[in-house]
From Swiss-Prot:
Pfam families assigned to the protein according to its UniProt record, in alphabetical order: SPOUT_MTase
Record field: catalytic activity: pseudouridine(1915) in 23S rRNA + S-adenosyl-L-methionine = N(3)-methylpseudouridine(1915) in 23S rRNA + S-adenosyl-L-homocysteine + H(+)
Family, similarity comment: Belongs to the RNA methyltransferase RlmH family.
Gene this chain is encoded by: rlmH
Subunit note: Homodimer.
UniProt keyword annotations, A-Z: Cytoplasm, Methyltransferase, rRNA processing, S-adenosyl-L-methionine, Transferase
The protein's name: Ribosomal RNA large subunit methyltransferase H
Length: 156
């Protein structure tokens, strides 16, 4: 199973790239983690936010390979602790499809992305900076994998 993070935003600071790559490298070959960056729409004083969200959503959905399970990161989504995320990872593997996880921009996700989702996940009740979410996602997914593989990374 391949896990694909599709995130709005490009040209992240070096610390974000290094943090993400640190965890991406650790994934096993049979479960690679891939990052697809979508250009954020230009936001300004008189920006049409609804139109920007629509364009970002179209680009995100176009990046999802046909047949993939779509999981959105959204505040009202399911809240999983680490063992529950490990259970989700196992369920996704058994489903036989690759997984695309959509991370919206500053205004969140387009309605079309939410409508296309098979599942919605709330990473935290906190508002997190979008660059940091990439690292938190990579680490959380790696930790969940480590539980399923009985790897010593996760400790109770």
């Amino acid at each position: 199973m391949k896990i694909q993070l599709i995130a709005v935003g490009t040209k992240m600071p070096k610390w974000v790239e290094e943090g993400f790559q640190e965890y991406r490298r650790r994934f096993p070959h049979d479960m690679p983690l891939e990052l697809v960056e979508i250009s954020a729409g230009k936001r300004g004083k008189n920006a049409d936010i609804a139109r920007i969200l629509q364009k970002e959503g179209e680009a995100m959905l176009a990046a999802v390979p046909k047949g993939n399970r779509i999981v959105t990161l959204d505040i009202p989504g399911k809240k999983w602790d680490t063992p529950q995320l490990a259970e989700q990872l196992e369920a996704w593997k058994l489903d036989g499809r690759d997984v695309s996880i959509l991370i919206g921009g500053p205004e969140g996700l387009a309605p079309a992305c939410k409508a296309a989702a098979d599942q919605s996940w709330s990473l935290s009740a906190l508002t997190l900076p979008h660059p940091l979410v990439r690292i938190v996602m990579a680490e959380s997914l790696y930790r969940a994998w480590s539980i399923t593989a009985n790897h010593p990374y996760h400790r109770e």
